[in-house]
Amino acid sequence: MAQKALEQTTVKEEKLELPTTIRGLAQLLDIPLVDCLLPCNFCGRFLDYLEVCEFDYKKLTLIWKDYSVYACCRLCCSATATYEFNVFYQQTVLGRDIELATGLSIFEIDIRCHTCLSFLDIIEKLDSCGRGLPFHKVRNAWKGVCRQCKHFYNDW
């Protein structure tokens, strides 16, 4: 019985040690970031170097399946964001009303871009609040528009 508990603890510890970022994986393997070849979890295509950098910049998390690692390419990030918005949309608030809806300060709210899934920094969040742009609640998480995707909406 004690041995079984020890084995379960060991398995849990092993899973906790798996890196969640590509940079962390590269450091663990002691290889340059440019040499990391990761398949996309959705389409199977390998991420190019720019997508590898974007993945970590967006603060996305690696997906581990039986000790095989997967990431998400740029196109699949956009497709996933669109799918989640269309299927799991809950509500929309404008500008500073997000603080009333959540009961939190804009500084404390985690917001991702609803187009590319990048985390919005404080400047992007304050800009959206100041302009009265919409924030959408999708799958119990808040979505806005990042500075790069704003250009697609001609809002710069």
From Swiss-Prot:
Plays a major role in the induction and maintenance of cellular transformation. E6 associates with host UBE3A/E6-AP ubiquitin-protein ligase and modulates its activity. Protects host keratinocytes from apoptosis by mediating the degradation of host BAK1. May also inhibit host immune response. The keyword Metal-binding applies. Transmembrane segments: none annotated. It comes from the Viruses. A zinc finger (unnamed) spans 40-76, 113-149. One of its GO terms (biological process) is symbiont-mediated suppression of host type I interferon-mediated signaling pathway. Keywords: Activator, DNA-binding, Early protein, Host cytoplasm, Host nucleus, Host-virus interaction, Inhibition of host innate immune response by virus, Metal-binding, Modulation of host cell apoptosis by virus, Transcription, Transcription regulation, Viral immunoevasion, Zinc, Zinc-finger. One of its GO terms (cellular component) is host cell nucleus. InterPro entries: E6 (IPR001334), E6_sf (IPR038575). GO terms for molecular function: DNA binding; zinc ion binding. It comes from Human papillomavirus 47. Forms homodimers. Interacts with ubiquitin-protein ligase UBE3A/E6-AP; this interaction stimulates UBE3A ubiquitin activity. Interacts with host BAK1. Pfam families: E6. This is Protein E6. SUPFAM superfamilies: E6 C-terminal domain-like. Belongs to the papillomaviridae E6 protein family.
